[in-house]
Amino acid sequence: MYLAILALPMFGSAVAGLRGRTIGVTGAHIITTGCLMTSAALSIVAFYEVGLSGSPVSIVIGSWIDSEFMLVQWGFLFDSLTVSMLLPVLIVSSLVHLYSISYMAGDPHNQRFFSYLSMFTFFMLVLVAGDNYFIMFVGWEGIGISSYLLINFWYTRMQANKAGMKALTVNRVGDMFLSVGFFAIFWVFGNVDYASVFSVAPYINETAITIIGLLLLVGAMAKSANIPLHTWLPDAMEGPTPVSALIHAATLVTAGVYLMLRSSPIIEYGPTVLVVITWVGALTAFFAATTGLLQNDLKRVIAYSTCSQMGYLFMAVGLSQYNVALFHLVNHAFFKALLFLAAGAVIHGMADQQDLRRLGGLVNFLPFTYTAILIGSLSLMALPFMTGFYSKDLILEVALGQYEVSGTIAYWLGTISAVFTAFYSFRLVSLTFFTTPNAPKGDYLHAHEAPMIIVIPLVILSIMSIVFGYIAKDMFVGVGTDFLSTALFQHPDHITLIEAEFGLPLLMKLLPAIGSLFGAGLALYLYHVVPSITISLTNGPIGYGVYSFLNAKWYWDALYNGLIIESGLRIGLVISKVIDRGIIELTGPYGLSTVLTGAGRSVATYDTGVITSYALYIMLGLVSLIFLVFAPTNMVFNEYGLSLILVYLSALVLLPSSTRTS
């Protein structure tokens, strides 16, 4: 059963990709979606057996690398962390497959699209279920390639090409550090198997742990879009909307967080690493929340909310609250998938329009889609008793419960980010559904709700966005729960959940919720009641400066393009001119041909046609040969040998000039 969870998505991908013309579009839909739904059902059974019944499963298929100093096996581990990740990955992926049947109905390359989707899911399952870091790396690289194929699915569009290459290139930076980190683990621990590495982690030098932790962190930052390696994430919106839902909800961006969670027995012994992770997460949450305030693309607003939520997850990891991070990861998968799929329903129903400034007044035309986006936005802003509330607010509480500088700063940055998150979430709702209609009249005349095959995933995700947090809270983060005790490690000094639950002032616990309600109300007031205020705010120099800074996304793209890319191109030009076309050309092909041509002409001058010259050459050759053959070894380079060489050279020089030039 456990191997079937992994094998079924790959089987569906292979059949749809290799036999797509034989089975047709409908066949590709049935096979890939059926395989994913079967895997999702089996993952629920696995969650019950492994997670709830406490029966971890380890499966070894065979040996991969077997040498004197390294043994890497094709092994898979199903513990409570693995099955907890399988739930959002497979449930969201199966719903995305079902949703895509209608959403991609008009595309001529359905078989290829569904093959890529299933392959993406398969590699994510390999990453999650592998029992060593090398198997994880196979899945890690697999989802990277799959994301490129999906983002660049419409490869005739220049922006899609650029977005795909950008995602692949930025992630390649993280992959380089990650691969070095994995080999550092092998060098320090002598193994890459989880059980072997984690068992000796407490006895390893702290400096080595810190270096390994930072290397793993850079890899996770690229994959989970934390600053400064976040720039690929908004551009990934060039792919089809189902791809956005799959990448941003349950697969690609969660891989980096999963790496940190799985490596908790290592990074727990590196306090410097934990502080750096906390700061990276807090700054990412704040940056993405401020940048999302001014985005006008429907999908990009949700993309920046994903980036912000990844910051919250990293913040929880840096605070050593791994169970809280996992809980928010699962919650986030459901309400973020709901937001993206509902946004796709808006785009689908409004003639592919996704500019917020060209929408408005859709609440009467798309009431069900409005309800779905409203539920997702309320869960994202952590409205009390929605799914997001039970994990997002808890992250801020445990940050304040640390009673450390990094934790306190993380709390305040996270709280401010929560206000901004609520603001841009309801800015999206207001501009899309409440404001004056701004789209062409024909778009409204043809506006329509999504068909039933799209409605079903939205209904399921809406229910999960409302009730899942309440149902799973005690299991994941309840006081005294041992659900994740065998999969995650938390040092006793870092346990602050009790303090966060019972020791903090009530005002500090309610402040994020109050701020979120204020941000949501402010957005509705500014964009629905008095929209003219938003224009006047940018008239002054300060307002215009802030607007320009946030609208330029903190100038990260300009920094990379101007400082790194342009400098690299200039250095490449200099290298090309000075070395490749300069030194190498002179000493290489051009210089070698010149030297050989000159040497050939010099040798040709000795072809004089004079018999006495030839006799001299023959005599010198014979004398030299006799000397080299019969002379003792120690005499070759003594005074006799040198004398013979001088005689030989003198004979060449003293030849009559007429003989040498005739």
From Swiss-Prot:
Keywords: Electron transport, Membrane, Mitochondrion, Mitochondrion inner membrane, NAD, Respiratory chain, Translocase, Transmembrane, Transmembrane helix, Transport, Ubiquinone
Protein name: NADH-ubiquinone oxidoreductase chain 5
Residues spanning the membrane: 40-62, 77-99, 112-129, 133-155, 168-190, 200-222, 243-262, 272-294, 301-320, 325-347, 360-382, 408-430, 450-472, 510-529, 609-631, 636-658
Coiled coil: none
One Gene Ontology CC term in the entry: mitochondrial inner membrane
Reactions listed under catalytic activity: a ubiquinone + NADH + 5 H(+)(in) = a ubiquinol + NAD(+) + 4 H(+)(out)
Family: Belongs to the complex I subunit 5 family.
The organism's taxonomic lineage, starting at the top: Eukaryota, Fungi, Dikarya, Basidiomycota, Agaricomycotina
Gene name of the record: ND5
Topological relation to the membrane, as annotated: Multi-pass membrane protein
Gene Ontology terms: biological process: ATP synthesis coupled electron transport; electron transport coupled proton transport
InterPro entries reported for this sequence: NADH_DH_su5_C, NADHpl_OxRdtase_5_subgr, ND/Mrp_TM, NU5C-like, Proton_antipo_N
Function: Core subunit of the mitochondrial membrane respiratory chain NADH dehydrogenase (Complex I) that is believed to belong to the minimal assembly required for catalysis. Complex I functions in the transfer of electrons from NADH to the respiratory chain. The immediate electron acceptor for the enzyme is believed to be ubiquinone.
Pfam families registered for this protein in UniProt: NADH5_C, Proton_antipo_M, Proton_antipo_N
EC number(s) per entry: 7.1.1.2
Location of this chain's protein in the cell: Mitochondrion inner membrane
